C-alpha cells in the first residue's frame, strides 16, 4: 500500500538562501535565531531553556540546518541517532509567498512574477476599490494600506463595527486581504465580498495570488482576535501538481488538512478537513492517516508557526509551538508503516527575530521518514520541486517538469 504524508511547518526556514540578497533577507534564519534565543534564556515566556526538539533532531533537522548555514543550531542534540533522510532545499520560485512555496513542493514552481500592491498607503487602485464598493453595495472601506493583520484590527476594528466598512489591506506578498467582524458584518457576507474581489482582480489582470478572508471577533482594541474561519481564494497552479496527477493518473485520494485545499485552489483535492491550531491539526491528521487507503496523500499545513508566531515576531511562542509539534511527532511516526513515507518540510521562512513582519527567503528542511527509507544526508536540493518529483516517482506518476527524486 502506497501512502505519502506531507507535513508543512509553515515558515520553518533553516537559514537564508543563496538569493536572499534579492529580498533583503541575508542572514535570516528562523530555526537558528529561535534556538539562539532559547539557549540564551531570552525565550523563556511560557517555556524555558534550550530549544528541545529530540524527535525532529532524530529525523536530521539539526544536521540539515548545519548544512544550510554552516552552524549547528544552539541547544539541539548534535549526537542524536539519525533515523531519517534529511536535506535542505532552496526555492527557485520568484517569490517567498505561501502559494509559490507549496506549488513548488508539489512540483510546479512559480517562475513568473506575481503582481503586488507596493504602495504602503493608498495601496489599491481607485478603479478597483470603486468596483468593489458598487458590486458589493458597501458603505465604503477602511485601511487601503500595508499592515500586519493584528495591528490593523487594533487600529480600525471598532470603526469597522460602527460603520460596516470592511478593512482592506495588503503586505509584501501578492495578497488582497479583507478583515471583517464575524458577528456585526457576517461571515457569509465576508466570503461573498472576497469572491467579488477575486473576480475583479482576475478580470482586471492584476495577477494577484490570493484574496484572503480574515474574519475576527472581539469588541475593543486588545481583545480583537482572528478566528479559524479564514478562507483563501487563490488562482489555480499553472500546471498539474502531484496532487492532480495522483487523482487523474491513479484514481488516488488527496486529503487536505488545514488550508492546503485553498492554497491549491481546490485543484487535485478529493477531501477537505478543517482544523485550527497545532493540536487540532495533529488530531485531524492522525485520524486521516488511520483511514488512508492505497494511493493516498494526506497533506497538512501547520499555519500557526507562520501566522501566530512568525509574522508576529514572537520568538518564545514559535519555540513553544515547535516543542509541542515535536512532542506529538511520535504519534504520527508510529502510523508510518510498510511502504509509507512521511515528509516534513516548509514553504518559506518567517524569522521571528527579523525586522518587519514579512516572510524571509530561506532554505527549508526536507526530512523523510519511513520503514524503507535509507537514513542519512541527501545533501542540498536545488529546488523544493525535488519533493514533488520524489512523490511522483514513488507513486509511479508521469515525471514532473522540475526537480530530481531525492530517494
From Swiss-Prot:
Keyword tags: Cytoplasm, Isomerase, Manganese, Metal-binding
Name of a matching Pfam family: Metalloenzyme
InterPro entries referenced in this protein's UniProt entry, alphabetically: Alkaline_phosphatase_core_sf (IPR017850), DeoB (IPR010045), Metalloenzyme (IPR006124), Phosphopentomutase_DeoB_cap_sf (IPR024052)
Matching Gene3D superfamilies: Alkaline Phosphatase, subunit A, Phosphopentomutase
Membership in a protein family: Belongs to the phosphopentomutase family.
Class of this enzyme: isomerase
Listed EC numbers: 5.4.2.7
CC terms in the record's Gene Ontology section: cytosol
GO biological process entries: 2-deoxyribose 1-phosphate catabolic process; 5-phosphoribose 1-diphosphate biosynthetic process; metabolic compound salvage; nucleotide metabolic process
Name of the protein described by the UniProt record: Phosphopentomutase
Binding-site list for Mn(2+) 1: 10, 347-348
Pathway noted in the entry: Carbohydrate degradation; 2-deoxy-D-ribose 1-phosphate degradation; D-glyceraldehyde 3-phosphate and acetaldehyde from 2-deoxy-alpha-D-ribose 1-phosphate: step 1/2
UniProt xrefs under CDD domains: PPM (cd16009)
Source lineage: Bacteria, Pseudomonadati, Pseudomonadota, Gammaproteobacteria, Enterobacterales
Its biological purpose: Isomerase that catalyzes the conversion of deoxy-ribose 1-phosphate (dRib-1-P) and ribose 1-phosphate (Rib-1-P) to deoxy-ribose 5-phosphate (dRib-5-P) and ribose 5-phosphate (Rib-5-P), respectively.
Cofactor note: Binds 2 manganese ions.
Intracellular or extracellular location(s): Cytoplasm
Amino acid at each position: 500500500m502506497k501512502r505519502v504524508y506531507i507535513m508543512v511547518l509553515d515558515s520553518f526556514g533553516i537559514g537564508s538562501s543563496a538569493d536572499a540578497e534579492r529580498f533583503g533577507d541575508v542572514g535570516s534564519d528562523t530555526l537558528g535565531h529561535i534556538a539562539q534565543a532559547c539557549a540564551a534564556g531570552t525565550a523563556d515566556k511560557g517555556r524555558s531553556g534550550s530549544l528541545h526538539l529530540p524527535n525532529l533532531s532524530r529525523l536530521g533537522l539539526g544536521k540539515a540546518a548545519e548544512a544550510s548555514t554552516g552552524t549547528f543550531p544552539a541547544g539541539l542534540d548534535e549526537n542524536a541517532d539519525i533515523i531519517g533522510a534529511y536535506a535542505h532545499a532552496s526555492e527557485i520560485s520568484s517569490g517567498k509567498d505561501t502559494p509559490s512555496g507549496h506549488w513548488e513542493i508539489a512540483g510546479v514552481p512559480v517562475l513568473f512574477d506575481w503582481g503586488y500592491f507596493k504602495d504602503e498607503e493608498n495601496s489599491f487602485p481607485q478603479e478597483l476599490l470603486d468596483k468593489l464598493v458598487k458590486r458589493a453595495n458597501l458603505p465604503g472601506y477602511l485601511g487601503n494600506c500595508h499592515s500586519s493583520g493584528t495591528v490593523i484590527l487594533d487600529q480600525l476594528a471598532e470603526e469597522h463595527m460602527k460603520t460596516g466598512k470592511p478593512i482592506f489591506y495588503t503586505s509584501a506578498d501578492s495578497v488582497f486581504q479583507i478583515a471583517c467582524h464575524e458577528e456585526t458584518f457576517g461571515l457569509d457576507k465576508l466570503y461573498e465580498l472576497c469572491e467579488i474581489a477575486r473576480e475583479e482582480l482576475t478580470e482586471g489582470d492584476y495577477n494577484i495570488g490570493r484574496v484572503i478572508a480574515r474574519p475576527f471577533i472581539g469588541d475593543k482594541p486588545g481583545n480583537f482576535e482572528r478566528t479559524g474561519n479564514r478562507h483563501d481564494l487563490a488562482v489555480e497552479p499553472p500546471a498539474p501538481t502531484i496532487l492532480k496527477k495522483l487523482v487523474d493518473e491513479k484514481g488516488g485520494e488527496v486529503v487536505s488538512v488545514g488550508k492546503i485545499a485553498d492554497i491549491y485552489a481546490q485543484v487535485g483535492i478529493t477531501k477537505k478537513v478543517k482544523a485550527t491550531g497545532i493540536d487540532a491539526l495533529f488530531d485531524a491528521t492522525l485520524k486521516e492517516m488511520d483511514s488512508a487507503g492505497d494511493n493516498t496523500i494526506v497533506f497538512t499545513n501547520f499555519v500557526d508557526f507562520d501566522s501566530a508566531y512568525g509574522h508576529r515576531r514572537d520568538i518564545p511562542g514559535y519555540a513553544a509551538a515547535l516543542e509541542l509539534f515535536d512532542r506529538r511527532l511520535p504519534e504520527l511516526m508510529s502510523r508510518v508503516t510498510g511502504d509509507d513515507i512521511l515528509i516534513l518540510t516548509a514553504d518559506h521562512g518567517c524569522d521571528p527575530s527579523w525586522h518587519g513582519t514579512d516572510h524571509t527567503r530561506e532554505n527549508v528542511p526536507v526530512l523523510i521518514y519511513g520503514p524503507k527509507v535509507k537514513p542519512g544526508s541527501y545533501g542540498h536540493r536545488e529546488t523544493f520541486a525535488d519533493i514533488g518529483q520524489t512523490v511522483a516517482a514513488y507513486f509511479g506518476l508521469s515525471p514532473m517538469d522540475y526537480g530530481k527524486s531525492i530517494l
